């Protein structure tokens, strides 16, 4: 193992010595991420979790999966998988949601599309949901911000907190989870505040009913029925998608292919490669993954084709 600059990245091509001083690596990691714990007991527990995660990444390096993507000791290295999932993977799929059947035979046959690198669009910086299960709000706002620029040539920085605090009547539950279509419904009925007027706090709050909500461009939403339709939709706009993000905890780079279709996280599809790999905008900050993004193997990987949708703008 070696430290590459400021990154605690485990190089796939390097043999990991059994003589590594895990305690020193842990100390470097804590310094990088400014971690301090409230008690010696908590410190010992977090070191144990860190060590377990280090061993998991070592084992991954020896597997065949490491040929297509890499892992690292990132900001989640002191969290167990259960803690990570309960904190960050809080998508609430409605019982009434119609999920598309998986299409194992889908193959993308188009050209590359990448809305993160398009001269017609001022691509917004990747945001960080923090320790709040508000992925659904960031997915909806991400699609709204980018698509409003693409389709209407208007630029906004919109408020996820407005959705967290105020869309409860639409069956969303703030930091305990929600659904992108429900967020689009809320915005269609009420408009949406700008971030400067309703800033993000990463916690549930009381709805600010008196705040101005100047964003009134949503007329509804469209649910996408298949991988084929998703591939067509990304040609013209970004798309909110639901995925299984359990295997994403330590993702660093490359094309991830192994996951289930248990939908637990809301993100934004922002591109597709010529080989069919999907490019995803996440909400865990720009230091996670590929500048805040992840690439998934083509087809219905991680359930990406199960429930895509996008807002209808006007």
Swiss-Prot record:
| Keywords, ordered alphabetically | Disulfide bond, Hydrolase, Protease, Secreted, Signal, Thiol protease, Zymogen
Instruction: Tell me where it resides.
Output: Secreted
Q: Which Pfam families match?
A: Inhibitor_I29, Peptidase_C1
Q: What is its EC number?
A: 3.4.22.15
**Molecular-function GO terms, alphabetical:** cysteine-type endopeptidase activity
Q: Which GO terms describe its cellular component?
A: extracellular space; lysosome
- Protein function: May be involved in extracellular digestion.
Protein name in UniProt = Cathepsin L 2
Q: Which CDD domains match?
A: Peptidase_C1A
Which positions carry the propeptide annotation?
Answer: 25-109
Which GO biological process annotations does it have? proteolysis involved in protein catabolic process
**Under which main EC class is this enzyme filed?**
hydrolase
Disulfide bridges in this chain:
132-175, 166-207, 259-302
User: Where does the signal sequence lie?
Assistant: 1-24
Q: What residue ranges are annotated as transmembrane?
A: none
Q: Where is the active site?
A: 135, 265, 282
Q: What reaction is this protein's catalytic activity?
A: Specificity close to that of papain. As compared to cathepsin B, cathepsin L exhibits higher activity toward protein substrates, but has little activity on Z-Arg-Arg-NHMec, and no peptidyl-dipeptidase activity
Q: Which SUPFAM superfamilies match?
A: Cysteine proteinases
The UniProt similarity line reads: Belongs to the peptidase C1 family.
């Amino acid at each position: 193992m070696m430290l590459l600059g400021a990154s605690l990245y485990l190089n796939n091509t390097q043999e990991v010595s059994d003589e590594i001083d895990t305690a020193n690596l842990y100390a470097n990691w804590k310094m990088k991420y400014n971690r301090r714990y409230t008690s010696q007991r908590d410190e010992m527990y977090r070191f144990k979790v860190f060590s377990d995660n280090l061993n998991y990444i070592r084992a991954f390096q020896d597997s065949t999966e490491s040929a297509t993507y890499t892992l690292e000791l990132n900001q989640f290295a002191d969290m167990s998988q259960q803690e990570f999932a309960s904190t960050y993977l809080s998508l609430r799929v409605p019982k009434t949601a119609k999920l598309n059947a998986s299409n194992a035979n889908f193959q993308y046959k188009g050209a590359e599309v990448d809305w993160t690198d398009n001269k017609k669009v001022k691509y917004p910086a990747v945001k960080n949901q923090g320790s709040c299960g508000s992925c659904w709000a960031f997915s909806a706002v991400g699609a709204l911000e980018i698509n409003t620029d693409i389709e209407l040539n208007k630029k906004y920085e919109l408020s996820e907190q407005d959705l967290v605090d105020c869309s409860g009547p639409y069956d969303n539950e703030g930091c305990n989870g929600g659904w992108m279509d429900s967020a689009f419904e809320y915005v269609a009925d009420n408009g949406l505040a700008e971030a400067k007027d309703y800033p993000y706090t990463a916690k549930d709050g009381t709805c600010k009913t008196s705040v101005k909500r100047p964003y009134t461009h949503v007329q509804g939403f469209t649910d996408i029925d298949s991988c084929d339709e998703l591939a067509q939709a990304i040609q013209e706009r970004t798309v909110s998608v639901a995925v299984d993000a359990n295997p994403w905890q330590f993702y660093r780079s490359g094309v991830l292919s192994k996951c289930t279709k248990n939908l637990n996280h809301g993100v934004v599809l922002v591109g597709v490669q010529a080989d069919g790999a999907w490019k995803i905008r996440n909400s865990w900050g720009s230091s996670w993954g590929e500048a805040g993004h992840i690439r998934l193997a083509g087809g219905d990987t991680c359930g990406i084709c199960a429930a895509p949708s996008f807002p209808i703008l006007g």
